[in-house]
């Protein structure tokens, strides 16, 4: 799998939503290798789009289409300031990788201090999986996109209300979930982006 992350700011979330719908109608049918996307705007205007493709080649072919270039030229006008692009084939899927039925998406971004710290995260996540499945029915899946030790983690929830309730639970140490909490305390430049009205696109 290959993932593209597009990130910036806008003052017009409704127009951004319309551009996503336009892409679905006019460009998705010709996007070979497209696996799906998650997009949205936070309450303070931060835009995040996560698009998934079968391969880097498929993503490049999509980007090189003239109609894709024309669509982006119009969409780019809705952003304020610079737009950041992150591409990666280093993608990890957890708990099924998410769902288009999610009512709330939370994006966590940051930087692990080193590769060893990244490995510890993977171990803690594996240890926590059983507890999460049994005690956090609000979690519908997750996707982690890595660029070296920089990461974008996309978590899918049934709803924001259920996600907040789930956050209040105190898992036992042996579950592995507490290890994830300890890990996050060491992450550099940690930030959370809440997408309360996610837009999903599927092939």
Residue map of PLM features:
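Short S/T/G/P-rich N-terminal loop/turn motif that feeds into the first structured element of a domain
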Residues: 1-48, 52-203
């Amino acid at each position: 799998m290959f993932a593209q992350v597009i990130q910036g700011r806008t003052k017009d979330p409704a127009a951004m939503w319309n551009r996503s719908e336009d892409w679905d109608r006019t460009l998705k049918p010709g996007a070979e290798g497209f696996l799906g996307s998650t997009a949205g705007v936070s309450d303070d205007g931060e835009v995040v789009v996560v698009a998934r493709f079968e391969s880097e080649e498929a993503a490049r072919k999509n980007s090189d289409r003239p109609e894709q270039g024309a669509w982006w030229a119009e969409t780019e006008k809705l952003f304020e300031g610079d737009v950041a692009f992150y591409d990666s084939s280093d993608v990890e899927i957890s708990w099924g990788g998410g769902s288009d039925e999610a009512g709330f998406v939370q994006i966590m971004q940051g930087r692990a201090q080193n590769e060893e710290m990244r490995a510890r995260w993977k171990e803690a996540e594996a240890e926590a999986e059983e507890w999460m499945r049994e005690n956090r029915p609000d979690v519908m899946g997750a996707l982690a996109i890595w660029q070296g030790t920089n990461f974008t983690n996309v978590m899918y929830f049934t709803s924001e209300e259920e996600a907040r309730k789930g956050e209040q639970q105190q898992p036992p140490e042996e579950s592995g979930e507490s290890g994830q909490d300890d890990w996050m305390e060491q992450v550099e430049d940690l930030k959370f982006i809440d997408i309360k009205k996610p837009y999903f696109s599927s092939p």
